[in-house]
Regions:
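N-terminal alpha-helical interaction blocks
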Residues: 1-99
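A gly/proline- and charged-residue-enriched helix-loop-helix capping module
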Residues: 80-124
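Cys/His-rich short segments
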Residues: 107-149
Length: 149
């Protein structure tokens, strides 16, 4: 068996992952969705229905977040009014709503969202940065400085 055939990803293509829970933040608050008697993390489909796929694609944090179930997307959303059923909560409050695994992943996602937000410009020269392909880093387009997550 060749090396390529022996490797299988732990997550499916985006189309298969559209209904999987994601970690979306508006500022420092986590987006949650009331679903009957329980509160849950929204899916890409839940947010795409109200914000549009173009808005979500623009807000997606590169690299996603590793979770117990594989890879999940994280989003840094602009402040908008959400429809009934959605709510915004701090992680401290969400601790009482989410299971331990989701809470831990939400904390990691929050850190990654904040890192991405605060590393859009190089700390060495002040120029814009871009996602460095194949890494969890931002690379300065002017001086080449790498800023790792």
């Amino acid at each position: 068996m060749g090396l390529v055939s022996a490797v299988s990803p732990k997550h499916g293509p985006r189309s298969e992952r559209a209904a999987v829970s994601i970690y979306a933040f508006m500022g420092s608050r986590l987006v949650l969705l009331a679903d009957g008697d329980r509160v849950r993390l929204p899916s890409v489909n839940d947010l795409a229905d109200i914000l549009g796929t173009e808005t979500l694609d623009h807000a997606r944090v590169p690299g996603g977040v590793r979770t117990e179930g594989g890879l999940a997307d994280a989003f840094a959303l602009e402040e908008v009014e959400l429809p009934t059923g959605f709510r915004l909560e701090s992680l401290r409050v969400a601790y009482h709503t989410l299971g331990l695994a989701d809470f831990r992943s939400a904390g990691t996602a929050r850190q990654k969202v904040e890192w991405y937000r605060t590393h859009r410009f190089c700390s060495r020269c002040g120029s814009a940065t871009e996602v460095a392909a194949g890494t969890e880093a931002m690379r300065c387009v002017a001086c080449g400085q790498m800023h790792f997550a």
